[in-house]
A protein has these predicted regions:
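Flexible, glycine/small-residue-enriched loop-and-beta-strand segment within the central core
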Residues: 1-56, 67, 72, 83-84, ...
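Catalytic beta-strand/loop signature of glycosyltransferases that borders the donor
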Residues: 75
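Leloir-type glycosyltransferase catalytic cores
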Residues: 101-102
Length: 102
């Protein structure tokens, strides 16, 4: 299953793949490995990203273009960049606090 929350923006050429068949194909497994993927509300996924099975992306997170997401849990307000990916937890929460006029 793939669950996409409200107000998410998924750019062009993004691959969301909850199944991995390579072990079955080369006869090292009897079944295809399937894992759910969840994008909470207000997640942005840049172009040419790959999101692998078992990933849970917290709300208000940004996945930068070209990133391969293979870690199971991305906390809310994170910036995720690169391959191998780097998770900057709370990056956007810090930006919101810094720009809050109150």
């Amino acid at each position: 299953n793939v669950v996409i929350g409200a107000h998410c923006d998924i750019a062009s050429f993004v691959t969301i793949n909850c199944a991995d068949s390579h072990l079955k194909c080369i006869e090292l497994a009897n079944s295809i490995d399937r894992k759910d993927i969840v994008l909470e509300n207000n997640v942005f996924v840049g172009s040419h990203c790959v999101i692998k099975g078992g990933v849970y992306i917290g709300h208000h997170s940004v996945i930068a273009a070209g990133t391969i997401v293979d870690t199971s849990h991305i906390p809310p307000y994170s910036l995720v960049i690169g391959n191998p990916m780097i998770v900057k937890e709370g990056y956007y929460l810090e930006e919101i606090i810094k720009n809050d006029p109150t």
